[in-house]
Design a protein with these regions (language model features):
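Solvent-exposed, acidic/polar segments of extracytosolic/periplasmic ligand-binding ectodomains
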Residues: 37, 346-409
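Beta-alpha junction/loop-to-helix N-cap segments that form part of ligand/metal-binding clefts
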Residues: 51-58, 66, 70-141, 151, ...
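Short, low-complexity disordered leader/linker segments with a strong preference
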Residues: 1-38, 404-409
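Extracellular/periplasmic periplasmic-binding protein-like sensory domains
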Residues: 243-318, 327-333, 376, 383-408
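Periplasmic-binding protein-like
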Residues: 97, 101-110, 130-132, 175-178, ...
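Short beta-strand segments enriched in small/hydrophobic residues
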Residues: 35-52, 173-177
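Extracellular/periplasmic Venus flytrap/periplasmic-binding protein
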Residues: 92, 137-140, 145-249, 285-295
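Venus flytrap/periplasmic-binding-protein-like
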Residues: 83, 137-140, 210-211, 252-276, ...
C-alpha cells in the first residue's frame, strides 16, 4: 500500500543565538539544537472533500507563528498526508508517523471512518489526536479516548441547531438522503432524534455511496415521499451535487425544503447564491463574523488565496491550543499531562470564546445558525451568510452524561 508522502514544514526559524556558556565550553563548540517537535495534519486533501481541506497546512503554520515559532526552545515541524477517505490508508499513515517519524499529535482527520481508525491507534500508542474534520458524535461517546479530542462540531450539535430550527419553522416531516458510512449514519441518527423530540416525524430515507455522481434515483424517492424537509446527511462534493440536482428536479420549487446538515462556506461558493439562497445551516466559524475573524482571514489569505472554512480555522485552533499546553507543561512527551492542561485551559482564539474541553474529549463551543443570502443581499462574492442565531455551547452539544463515553463514570 502506498502511503501518501509527507509534506514537511519547519516552524519559523528562530534568530541564531550566540553560544551560551554552561560550565566550561570549549572554544568553537556548537550548542546542540533540540530535536523539532513533530505534529501532523491528515485529511482528505483530494477527492470529495479536497476543496474543504485546502489550506490546513497554512493554518497550522499560523498557529506556530502565534506561539513564537518555537515551543520550549524546539522548532515545530509539520507533516501532512492525504488519507484518501480510506480508513486503512489513514491507519497506515498514523502508525508510520507515530512509530517512525516521532509525531506527537495528529489533527484534521475528516471522514468519520478514518477518524475512528486513527483514534484506535492513537489510544493504543498513548498519543494525541485532535479531530477537527470528522463529525460523528461517537468520537466523544463510545469511541472517546483519554488522549483524544473532538474539536469543531459533531453530528449532535449540527442536529440540535439546524434540525431544531427547521422543525420549529414548520418542517415537521423529514426524508433523509444519507452518505453510506459512519458520518452519514450518525448524522441521520442524531437529526432524527431531534426531529422526533420536537414533535416531527421521519417518513423515510435512502443511502448513497460516497462520491455519487448521479442522485436522480435518490432524489425521486425523496420527492415522492412528500416530506416537507429533505435532510442531506452528507458533505463536500456530495452535498453540492445533490443540491444542484435537486434544483434540476424542481424539488424546492415544488414546496419541499432542503436541509444541508453539514454545509461549508466553500460549498456555498461552489453552488453560487442563486442556487443556495435561503439554505439554513450551522457553522462554528465564518470569516465575516466580526473584526477578529476578518483580520485573521486577511492574514490567512496572504498564505492561501481562498476563503477559509471552519475546517481551516479548526486546524488553526486545535494546533494553537495544543502548542500552548505543551509550552505550559514543558514537554510533549507525556500525552496525558498535555491533555490535562488542554482541559484545564479555556480555549480562546479566533473561532472560540471561553471554550471548554470536557473529559470525554468534546470541545464545547458556541455554534452559529446562518442563512445563505440572496444575490440581491450580497455585496461581494465572499458575502454569503446572514447570522440567524448563536447557540451557546451548553445548548448545542450533548450533555456529558448522555454520550456513553466509558471514561465518564
Amino acid at each position: 500500500m502506498k502511503i501518501a508522502n509527507a509534506v514537511r514544514y519547519a516552524g519559523l526559524v528562530a534568530a541564531v543565538t550566540g553560544l551560551t556558556a554552561v560550565g566550561l565550553v570549549a572554544v568553537g563548540q556548537v550548542q546542540a539544537q533540540p530535536a523539532p517537535l513533530k505534529i501532523a495534519v491528515m485529511d482528505g486533501f483530494s477527492g470529495v472533500y479536497g476543496d474543504l481541506t485546502a489550506g490546513e497546512v497554512e493554518a497550522m503554520q499560523m498557529a506556530i507563528e502565534d506561539v513564537g515559532g518555537k515551543v520550549n526552545g524546539r522548532s515545530v515541524e509539520i507533516l501532512s498526508a492525504d488519507h484518501q477517505t480510506k480508513p486503512d490508508v489513514g491507519a497506515a499513515i498514523a502508525r508510520k508517523w507515530y512509530d517512525v517519524d516521532g509525531v506527537k499529535m495528529i489533527t484534521g482527520l475528516g471522514t468519520s471512518s478514518v477518524a475512528l481508525a486513527v483514534r484506535k491507534i492513537s489510544q493504543e500508542k498513548g498519543l494525541i489526536d485532535i479531530i477537527t474534520g470528522a463529525a460523528s458524535a461517537d468520537l466523544s461517546g463510545p469511541a472517546c479516548s483519554p488522549t483524544g479530542a473532538h474539536w469543531v462540531y459533531d453530528t449532535y450539535a449540527l442536529a440540535q441547531v439546524t434540525g431544531d430550527a427547521l422543525v420549529k419553522a414548520g418542517g415537521d416531516s423529514w426524508f433523509f438522503l444519507t452518505a453510506d458510512y459512519a458520518f452519514g449514519h450518525a448524522l441521520e441518527r442524531d437529526v432524527s432524534a431531534v426531529v422526533k423530540a420536537a414533535g416531527g416525524k421521519v417518513v423515510g430515507g435512502v443511502r448513497h455511496p460516497l462520491s455519487t455522481q448521479d442522485f436522480s434515483s435518490f432524489l425521486l424517492q425523496a420527492q415522492a415521499s412528500k416530506a416537507k424537509v429533505i435532510g442531506l446527511a452528507n458533505a463536500g462534493q456530495d452535498t453540492i451535487t445533490s443540491i444542484k440536482q435537486a434544483g434540476e428536479f424542481g424539488i424546492v420549487k415544488g414546496g419541499q425544503k432542503l436541509a444541508g446538515l453539514l454545509v461549508f462556506a466553500t460549498d456555498v461558493q461552489s453552488l453560487t447564491l442563486p442556487v443556495a439562497q435561503g439554505l439554513v445551516l450551522t457553522e462554528a466559524f465564518y470569516w465575516d463574523l466580526n473584526d477578529e475573524t476578518r483580520a485573521w482571514t486577511k492574514r490567512y489569505r496572504a498564505k492561501k488565496d481562498r476563503t477559509p472554512s471552519m475546517l481551516t480555522a479548526g486546524v488553526y485552533s486545535s494546533t494553537l491550543h495544543y502548542l500552548k499546553a505543551v509550552q505550559a507543561v514543558g514537554s510533549p512527551d507525556d500525552a496525558l499531562k498535555v491533555m490535562a492542561k488542554m482541559r484545564e485551559m479555556p480555549v480562546n482564539d479566533v473561532m472560540t470564546k471561553n471554550g471548554k474541553l470536557r473529559e470525554d474529549g468534546r470541545l464545547v463551543r458556541d455554534m452559529h445558525l446562518f442563512q445563505v443570502k440572496a444575490p440581491s443581499e450580497s455585496k461581494h462574492k465572499d458575502d454569503i451568510y446572514k447570522l440567524i442565531a448563536t447557540v451557546p455551547g451548553d445548548k448545542a452539544y450533548r450533555p456529558l452524561n448522555e454520550g456513553k463515553c466509558p471514561l465518564i463514570k
